[in-house]
Amino acid sequence: MACAALLSDASSGTDGSPIDVLIVDDSLVVRRVLGRVLGEDPRFRVVGTVASGKQALAFVAKKSVDLVLLDIDMPELDGLQVLPHLLGPDQRRQVVLLSGSCSEGSEVALQALALGAGDVVAKPSAGHFSPQFVEHLLDRLAHLAPAAERSRTPERFDEASARLRPPGTLVRAVAIGGSTGGISAILSVIKGLEDNPAFPIFITQHLPASFQPLLAEQLRRATHLPVVLAEQAMPVQPGTIHLAPGTAHLSLGKGARGQILVRLSTQRCLHESFPAVDPMFTALARHYGRGACGVILSGMGRDGLAGAQAIVGADGWVIAQDHQSSAVWGMPGSVVKGGLASATLPPAQIAELILQQWQAGA
């Protein structure tokens, strides 16, 4: 049910004009190769090539750019230092890290995603841009292109005028979902909840499977609460963080004795996020009812919207990350605009509200 909800923004239509790309790499050879590769694809238009993070900031201050291809190891400002500033004042410009340091599953790659990168791609040496790599890169960039194109005319929404629902007074379980920019927000929420071991916590973050063990390790460093990668039929434990694996959606079911168990699903959702937030939220609503608390954090698209509807329909409640603290306000924004949120807050205050309402209902 949750998987049949809404298409993500990444699959929405665009106006057909090419995406304006800035290439940032200290290697002249790489800049030329990437410029040629992108220049031959009608979906993209290379508007500039620069050799450093400092030059990139100067460029975007003067010229509109939809998508930035960014190296990490550069003089003056490296890619990780400049990344948050390149996202733009409304945090809607797409930045893709393309670096030899960004092998899939590496801690550097996870750090880049935590800072708001739309994607990370491991870069081969300049002389080894094979046709297979070029096709892979263009496919990854094309997936982000519709969202980058919409950054030209960002939708205006007065967050202060949003209709908010009353917060719940019963907290039996908390489920947290995020995507682009969500990792740092998740860590902040978890740090605020670590002194309360009374309820189980479920987390779905849009990440490939190879990154999930690294995220689990980051969570363990952030809290003394136990952190487990969810497995099929695993009993749900209070005071434990259950992290969705990258290979399946995190859902819930009941065992023969009525205990709540982890259920993993590989059913594809229409919005194609994997793992997706909607199945987790929907399962939370089904098994915890008015004690279900959903938290939707920074991310592109609308994953979590259908699940938030399920939580509210079961008399549970949902908290959305506020616009100002979000790298991308797509997922939380869709919940707020849908009138489903009980509060819009920065991550640290989300944890405070959950504990406040839990104590009120204890």
State where each predicted segment sits.
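Conserved acid/base catalytic micro-environments in cytosolic active-site loops
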Residues: 2-23, 27-43, 49, 54-69, ...
